[in-house]
C-alpha cells in the first residue's frame, strides 16, 4: 500500500492502569506483542501492578515487555517524543509523525469522543435484541492530563489492538489514514439464531474479514450468553 517503509523503530506503549487483566485485554496484548515483534517494533505494557499475575501464555509471548513504572517515569527524558493517540485530539495521525515522534502511547479503546463504551447487540430468530453496554475506565483522559502531544485516528471507535495496528501502518509503513481499508461494525455469527454486532472499526484483512486477535471470536462466542463485562 505504501511506497516506503520507515527505518525508524516504532515504540508502542499501552498504559494498563488497571488492577486486573480481563480475557479480552489479554488477547489484545498478545496480538499487539506478536505483530510488534514481527514488524521490528517494540511493545511496552506500562503501569502494570506488581500484584498482577500475567497469564502464562501471555507472559511467554514474543515481543511483550512488562513495565511496572508509568510512562512518565520510563520516558521522562523524552516527553516531547511521545505521541498520545487521543480521540479528542485536533490533528489526525499522519506518516510524518513517524519522524517527529519515537513513542506512541495508548490508553485503551479509541474512537468516539466521548467514548460510548462497548455495545453488543444479539439478534435472535424472533427479532429479540439484547444490548449490553460495558464502560471501561477512560484511560485516555487520564493520560491527556499529562500534557503529551495528541493525534487522532479518525472518528470511529477502535479496539486497542486495531488502534495500534493502524498507527503502525501510518507511521512505519507510511500509509495515510484515509487509504487504509476498514470494516465498520462487523457481525459475528454466534450460532444459527444469533449474531453479534461489534461496535468498532477494524482493519480489513486479505481475506476480506476484520483483523482480530487470535482467539477473540471464540471468546465472544463462548461468553455470548454471559456477562461480557467479564471479558474486558
Label the model's feature ranges.
Residues 38-134:
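S-adenosyl-L-methionine/SAH cofactor-binding core of RNA-modifying enzymes
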Residues 140-190:
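Structured adenosyl-cofactor binding patch, chiefly the S-adenosyl-L-methionine
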Residues 124-150:
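Hydrophobic/aromatic-rich, well-ordered segments within soluble, folded domains that form packed cores
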Residues 20-21, 111, 158-159:
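Glycine-/small-residue-rich active-site loops that bind phosphorylated ligands and cofactors
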Residues 2-48, 52, 60-66, 70-71, ...:
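Core subunits and conserved enzymes of cellular information-processing
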Residues 27-32, 95-97, 142:
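A short acidic, amphipathic alpha-helical/loop segment
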Residues 25, 118, 135-139, 159-163:
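Alpha-helical interaction elements in eukaryotic regulators
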Residues 15, 107, 123, 151-159:
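Short beta->alpha connector loops at strand-helix junctions that form conserved
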Amino acid at each position: 500500500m505504501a511506497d516506503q517503509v520507515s527505518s525508524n523503530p516504532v515504540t508502542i506503549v499501552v498504559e494498563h492502569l488497571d488492577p486486573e487483566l480481563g480475557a479480552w485485554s489479554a488477547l489484545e496484548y498478545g496480538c499487539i506483542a506478536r505483530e510488534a515483534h514481527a514488524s521490528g517494533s517494540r511493545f511496552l505494557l506500562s503501569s502494570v501492578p506488581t500484584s498482577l499475575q500475567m497469564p502464562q501464555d501471555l507472559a511467554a509471548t514474543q515481543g511483550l515487555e512488562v513495565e511496572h513504572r508509568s510512562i512518565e517515569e520510563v520516558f521522562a527524558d523524552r516527553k516531547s517524543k511521545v505521541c498520545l493517540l487521543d480521540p479528542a485530539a485536533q490533528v489526525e495521525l499522519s506518516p510524518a509523525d513517524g519522524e517527529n515522534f519515537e513513542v506512541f502511547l495508548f490508553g485503551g479503546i479509541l474512537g468516539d469522543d466521548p467514548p460510548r463504551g462497548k455495545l453488543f447487540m444479539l439478534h435472535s430468530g424472533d427479532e429479540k435484541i439484547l444490548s449490553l453496554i460495558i464502560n471501561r475506565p477512560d484511560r485516555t483522559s487520564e493520560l491527556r492530563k499529562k500534557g503529551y502531544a495528541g493525534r487522532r485516528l479518525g472518528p470511529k471507535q477502535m479496539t486497542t489492538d486495531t488502534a495500534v495496528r493502524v498507527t503502525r501502518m501510518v507511521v512505519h509503513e507510511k500509509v495515510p489514514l484515509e487509504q487504509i481499508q476498514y470494516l465498520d461494525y462487523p457481525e459475528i455469527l454466534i450460532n444459527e439464531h444469533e449474531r453479534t454486532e461489534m461496535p468498532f472499526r477494524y482493519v480489513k484483512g486479505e481475506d476480506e474479514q476484520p483483523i482480530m486477535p487470535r482467539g477473540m471470536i471464540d471468546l465472544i462466542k463462548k461468553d455470548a450468553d454471559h456477562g461480557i463485562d467479564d471479558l474486558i
